[in-house]
Amino acid sequence: MASTTANPPLPPLTHILETCIYVRDIAASAKFYQETLGIAPFFESPRVTGFSLGVTTLLLFELGQTNSDVHTPTGTIPHHGPSPRVLASLQDKTDGHGEEEQSLKQHFCLAVQSPEQVEQWEGHLQAKGVKLLSRMGWERGGKSVYFEDLDGHVVEIASRGVWPHY
């Protein structure tokens, strides 16, 4: 006879708490994000720098510093990041043929409320000399601007009207 006891529903997931990107020079990248976005780190170490953005967190990890588990008295943070072969390619300044250095080109998006605020950020980024990659107008009325950080990551600033839920 089958059990009639139902499992309770799982608690809902509410948001992504952490977004992490891998950088070649943690100090230079932290300075770029501080000066470009006007955000201050809440945590800094040779391995990771953390920035608070509302209820979410942007983590910058130094390439090669996350390939071992981190053991603490309360648990273990598992290793993550590029495999050793990919890591070696990313840490090499060229591809061996004198071509441009390798990049993960990770992407993440930062939220603002309105298309006008995206335009304000675009002007700010231009004034700072940040490499703008593109602009996008969305069917729902949202707007995005894309720019590149020091490691070639694609950062987006977008307004409401991009997705059905935002």
Language-model segments: which ranges?
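N-terminal beta-strand motif that seeds the catalytic metal site of vicinal oxygen chelate
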Residues: A2-A28, K105-L110, G161-Y166
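Vicinal oxygen chelate
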Residues: A2-P9, E122-Y166
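Amphipathic alpha-helical segments
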Residues: D25-A40
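Short, conserved charged micro-motifs
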Residues: A28-S29, P115-W121
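Short secondary-structure junctions
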Residues: G38-F43, L132-R135
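Conserved short beta-strand elements that form part of the metal-binding/catalytic scaffold
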Residues: P41-Q102, V154-R160
